[in-house]
Amino acid sequence: PALQGDLRRPAASPRRARADDEYLRTDHRICETVICVDRRMSYTAVNGILTGEMEGLQEEHAELVPLFKRMEELSGIVRERRRKRGAIDFDFPESKIFLDEKGRPLEIRPYERNTATKIIEDFMLLANETVAEDFYWQSVPFLYRTHDTPDPEKMKQLSVFINNFGYFIRMQQGEIHPKELQKLLDKIEGTPEEPLLARLTLRSMKQAKYTTECSGHFGLAARYYTHFTSPIRRYPDLQIHRIIKEAIHGELKEKRQAHYEQLLPQVAVQTSALERRAEEAERETEKLKKCEYMAKHIGETFEGVISGVSNWGFYVELPNTVEGMVHISELRDDYYIFDESRYELTGELKKKTYKLGQPVRVIVSGTDRMLRTVDFVLDRDL
């Protein structure tokens, strides 16, 4: 494991950081370091200590509790500062799938972000920004993680669509500030239409990518950003660590810089493409495992909420994050018409409606491993 207890690990770190009274970074130094792992802690354990839900752990790790508390305080300050500048935080439900030794799904649960995971996330984002800014001003060849401003036409289409639900976003000369999308996500939080509008907002934005030009990160509202913190699992981070080490040792001479100027554009294009391919493979694998899991529950009843509506039926999301479809052909009590503006199915005779966020009880009627889909039929409305 990368952080096994009682081991020393070589690393590169933004160290000797100084901050003013408002915790704004005023100075830093990036150097080679050695991480001394005194104790290996889990997110669950640290979160339990911070929330007070695990008193036994608080006593066992009493000398670390003040450190965790300071980390929590600093994390909150960093996150709030990011929020104020307009950073967008999509909080889509993620799945945690437990497999047996043969790769068969045993259980599926929602993966929940907690205080401990947010601390590490905030600190990693800050480290990434710090490294990106440092090497931008060194004017040496480098890899950046960039996220371009959304296409004006897509933002106009999003604006028209959300107006159907009573929301709006402000644009100026076809451009939008990330804070507008942040405010939209805040307004829809907890509403029945949140899953739909949040996904549409994400799809209306451009994909982040790796580039050699530091053009900023729209979603994070950051002027400088890179991927530095995960060299053991992401190639761009590893490439950056190589450049950093050469810079630290004074080896980035003219010849090496010319080498990187020729190499890095190819690295950026290839790693961006491979990242998209890996994400697609991950999504398809998750769908497959969910399909395999639900195949063991055909005929069983589950409670869920309607997460999407279309002219061919509606999707139902279960508490374990599995999503399946109730096909319109299974709604046999009436002839249902899809209202595209309100995202509702309404019965022509009885006027019964099925809409976003509506609780329903469903029976698993089938699965398709090839298509990676789950089919439901209604048991009865809640």
Regions of interest found by a model, annotated:
Residues 1-9, 15, 19-382:
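Conserved, carboxylate-rich catalytic/transport cores that coordinate ions
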